[in-house]
């Protein structure tokens, strides 16, 4: 009996020591993870160079196209309306949205290490999600503006003056940058146990949570709730607004009036469809739990490949915007003409 008790005591002490060593190892590894490795797209060197060239071109086109939209709205006094003031926020947002990820991705195409610091990873995570969240709020604000303009055209100048439109944009920026603070903080506090390889080209919550050496069901549930509430609430608001717009447009007697209203809203709906279709596949569909699967390429699609086309969508289907861009290019060419009189 004495020997059996001693044996049990030894087993208990051994288990306690093993448990203590395990958590000590977790703590040490957690403190030693100072950087992450972004696996990105593990192609051959030739394909990496090709990807660098293609994505550099799309990034430059995104910057140029969105800057042209901003300058056109800024310089043309006819575009100083609530609709175009909200529209000018959108390309400014797009510039910073792609800048939060693309430069680092381009550097990794030419790098052999593909590393990003711990703080740099979570800063990228914060700005990427904050810009994306702000974009959903601005898309909702633009839908609300179009709903008022088309459904209540006589009251629109009183209900939505320029100053009120500017004040409406400020909460979109503030809420966008505050919304994901809690999930980002919770993920940053997870122990990573020396596991630092992220199977993605950016710091995304799904791959980061999977690196944790302890289960984090509460953090996963909170992230899922935040994503679902944001996506479905703003999408419901946008679709409801455009349902009212479509009902009002169908009551317009003239075909010309219907065409003008649909052309104004068509560009916005195109951007909404591309953006929400992509983020729903990544964050609320069954593939959202597979970081190595389709979501990495869908993220590439909506964060890198579609932004260059948004300025084209807004300008080609909008007569006022095309005219403002034509005036802007004409002014630039006139100023660059040699021998021009001051």
Regions found by a protein language model. Name each.
Residues 1-21:
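Charged structural interfaces that engage phosphate-rich ligands
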Residues 20-342:
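Transmembrane helical core of 7TM receptor-like proteins
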